């Protein structure tokens, strides 16, 4: 019987959870769920100078916001240093690793010689078979692995296929530094083994590490997990992803008004697809996702595609759920604080009532917030340039003409107001747009908004008529 699947996401807490890391976490999470297994979380915090508690908190917060839950407690790699040291010393006892007393000066000479000979710098193995009794006084040794010197190391990768590395290129690399701290290469192997990780899904920039890590697995006689090295994300222009392309933290996407479900849907399709399906539920992703279907080629990040997908999710969202998502993100978005401060019971009710019209036109929560500002605007309204041009003499004359009919309206509903304005259009011979445009400008201060009858209904009779009268003068 095969072992249950255990994946892991292992970020370094030296900054935010960037978009590439978020996709790696998503792929690990989906594969674990698809296989009925677990996804574990390990914080690779051995770089004590650059690792911060704030970065760890940001990573956990980003994963939680994306809806990517992990099994058990997050594990600190730094706290496992004694175990890493124990395994390194066990490898020495097994004859699979050795103490190296080469001085910094000797290592510098090796590098210089390699440079002169035009080859990559390599440790020359001078302590590989020497007796430690010959060690110079006062030199604290490192521990180096005895890497195989002939043949190849094979990495069997579910995405990249079989990848072979000449052993002559692998070097007797360090697994324990002279101060007793483990190298990244060693700590990762020990942790993955001890945590029972069966599948490693990570960026293909780790592919060369996989060969060296395989050497450690083999030396300890441990099973090598199934490797899947996924392609990196590039910008829309094919260049390596940078901040101008979208290499931002997950928190930045939240502040830009994207919904977590939409971002998940977008990220899953960066390097993986299921036929022509663009929009898929989380349940469908879990059912369909398999690492063997991940593409080898780099995926391209496209903000327009992300916005389009986010718009689909917003239009499909329940009004109250979307309202709650907007309220939660207001402190983080431009102009959001002013809305939050003005949000009393009456305006909360108006905002929720406006949601059907607002979400039809907005691609992000930021656009949604911006479109909702007419609810919070103080009278007399400030007009933008287009609205001011609509409220010229002709526009104000239209308002003056339609105002009595609106004042006489019985019910103040979208349907009845639609009927009032259409009847007025027929009576005066004006096209509906000729009435709706100055009405919209007087009610919102803008030339674009949700449907004008929705706006009239949301604002209510008293506020709507007051705003129209303000512009008639």
Curated annotation (Swiss-Prot):
SUPFAM superfamilies for this protein: An anticodon-binding domain of class I aminoacyl-tRNA synthetases, Nucleotidylyl transferase
EC class of the enzyme, as a word: ligase
Localization terms from the record: Cytoplasm
Residues that bind ATP: 243
Protein EC: 6.1.1.17
GO BP, one annotated term: glutamyl-tRNA aminoacylation
Motif ('KMSKS' region): 240-244
Biased composition (Basic and acidic residues): 114-133
Predominant localisation class: cytoplasm
Classification via InterPro entries: aa-tRNA-synth_I_cd-bd, aa-tRNA-synth_I_codon-bd_sub2, aa-tRNA-synth_I_CS, aa_tRNA-synth_I_cd-bd_sf, Glu-tRNA-ligase_bac/mito, Glu/Gln-tRNA-synth, Glu/Gln-tRNA-synth_Ib_cat-dom, GluQ/Sye
Family in the record: Belongs to the class-I aminoacyl-tRNA synthetase family. Glutamate--tRNA ligase type 1 subfamily.
Record function comment: Catalyzes the attachment of glutamate to tRNA(Glu) in a two-step reaction: glutamate is first activated by ATP to form Glu-AMP and then transferred to the acceptor end of tRNA(Glu).
Protein name (database record): Glutamate--tRNA ligase 1
Organism of provenance: Brucella anthropi (strain ATCC 49188 / DSM 6882 / CCUG 24695 / JCM 21032 / LMG 3331 / NBRC 15819 / NCTC 12168 / Alc 37) (Ochrobactrum anthropi)
Gene responsible for this protein: gltX1
